[in-house]
Amino acid sequence: MTASGEDSSYVLGSHEGERDRLQRQHAIWRDDCLAAWQQAGWGAGQRLLDLGCGPGFASLDLAARVGPTGRVLAIDNASAYLEHLQAQARQSNLQQLHTLALDLNQASGVEALGDGQWDGAWCRWVAMFLNDLNPLLDLMTRALRPGGTLILHEYGQWDTFALYPRGAGLDRFVCRCIQHWRDHGGDPHVAQRLPALLEARGLRLKHCRSLMACSTSDAPKAQWLQDFLGSYPDQLAAAGLWSPGDQEELDADLSHAMGHCSVWVTPALMEMVWEKPCISSKP
């Protein structure tokens, strides 16, 4: 997802400015996506789900990966994002790419996907925004065929987001973001809960790795953090969680960072690859 706002409950919004930020975000994290898909063996002719697809930048890459003999179903609840993705798919003649409007907070829609019909499911930055994880996890588990794979990119510890030397403005921003998401029912440390929940549904963890990064101010992942710092204070201010004084202090931290040697540290993003076991036949 990306999350919730004008269309429904997208906490980060689904307006054009946020869509553009998400496009830049996907470009920065794209190599990590491609590496995960490659390791999972996703390729031509497969049937894949993109759960919480947002504007569909990953969906387009998945559609190119499976080719004309495959199928990608991109699922989201933001109509503006789905319309944008549909237009992009038509422009690129990606007839294998389809969309479905579905609220992943609700226990519905499994029937539309069918039981055991999908080779893989991709889910990035979605679980952290959901009030109830059960509908999403149940949908993924039922939709995958035996031997199918689920790839998750979710945060295990969002408050590792930091800038060194430390500044009170950025520290306050991180705390207020976490408060804002929790006020909306989200969990910015959601990956900590996923192993137990998915194991209880019979899935097996095949692979995991940390995608946490630290970098200098001019590196892409530092620029991704700077991009977020330029847009999200408005959301916090609208919620009454951010004042002009807070912004002045954050601006001072950023100005110092850009003029001196500084280290940016991302939130602790985790990659997990899960498999739905094949049903063994008894002799």
Label for each model-derived stretch:
Residues 7-29:
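Class I SAM-dependent methyltransferase Rossmann-like catalytic core
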Residues 27-46, 61:
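Conserved alpha-helix/loop element of class I SAM-dependent methyltransferases that forms part
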Residues 49, 55-110:
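Class I SAM-dependent methyltransferase SAM/SAH-binding core
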Residues 110-120:
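A short acidic, Gly/Pro-enriched loop at the edge of an enzyme's catalytic core
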Residues 119-134:
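A short SAM/SAH-binding and catalytic strip from SAM-dependent methyltransferases
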Residues 134-149:
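A short glycine-rich, Lys/Arg-flanked "PGG" loop and its adjoining helix->strand segment in the class I
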Residues 151-219:
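Conserved catalytic/acceptor-binding region of the Class I
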Residues 188-189, 199, 206-283:
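Conserved Class I S-adenosyl-L-methionine
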